[in-house]
Amino acid sequence: MPNITVNGIDHHYRLEGPADAPVLTLAHAQGFTLDSWAAQFDHFAGRYRVLAPDLRGHGGTAMAGAAYRIEDLAADFVALLDALGIERIHYAGASLGGMAAFALALDHADRLRSVSFVTTQGILPQASIDGQRAATDVMRRDGAEARVDAILERYLRKGYREDRPDSYAELRRQFLNVPVEGYAEAGAAIFAMDFDDRIGAIDLPVMVIAGEHDIATTPERMALYRDGIPGARMDIVPNAGHMPYVEEAGAFNAILAGFIDSQPTG
């Protein structure tokens, strides 16, 4: 998979599918990498051109080395599209990637055909900020190994580790390969964001996708975006937590495909 420098940062990305097909861009969660979208590449790359980068400080993409905002992640996407000669995209972002979706939808709507918000939110409750700061402090002191299993067990449905040990091990591998400071830089950007007061201004086809058993971003929390964004649709992936695109990829793919396939191709 290639690398390209945009906005002064070396970005790692994967791009597959027919050159003349509509582009579906996938953005991963904090602490993970573009590899978390493996099942979506398998499903969509036959008829869409599928693009997924590693976000700043994750996977093969360099750290920013300084504080940044969620809006800067959106600017990275726009610069990447420009560098690759891509005009407009369907965008699906999970958690951190979904937070960037708010900035894209509000500030760069002309680059989007549609946007799918996956297990994400536009402002983090203070209790969540406090919990993540504490977890980051532990990882800075003791390494990511000290928190990886607690974080995965919060994100994944109950019993996933036992039911899908290979998948669990792959997610664990991704998390441990993200530098702690890359995770922390993303966390600082998340803590500072506040998009919820502006969601009524989003004027795009929108799908909101929740996981039935997600305790990090509950379906009830996600419903605020269905209700607050004009024309937004919502679906819930059964038997999934915070990572439905991994936990129940078949059901997730069906929901996403049903939405983006219904959009105009022009």
Where are these regions (language model features)?
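Conserved HGGG/HGGXW glycine-rich cap/lid loop of the alpha/beta-hydrolase fold
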Residues: 9-66
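Flexible "cap/lid" loop of the alpha/beta hydrolase fold
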Residues: 102-107, 112-142
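Gly/Ala-rich beta-loop-alpha elbow adjacent to hydrolase catalytic centers
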Residues: 93, 97, 101
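Conserved alpha/beta-hydrolase catalytic His-Asp/Glu region
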Residues: 126-130, 142-200
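Short beta-strand/loop motif that positions the catalytic acidic residue
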Residues: 202, 208-210
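Acidic catalytic loop of the alpha/beta-hydrolase fold
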Residues: 212-217
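Catalytic active-site module of serine/aspartate enzymes centered on a nucleophile-bearing elbow/loop
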Residues: 232-266
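Conserved acidic catalytic loop of the alpha/beta-hydrolase fold
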Residues: 71-89
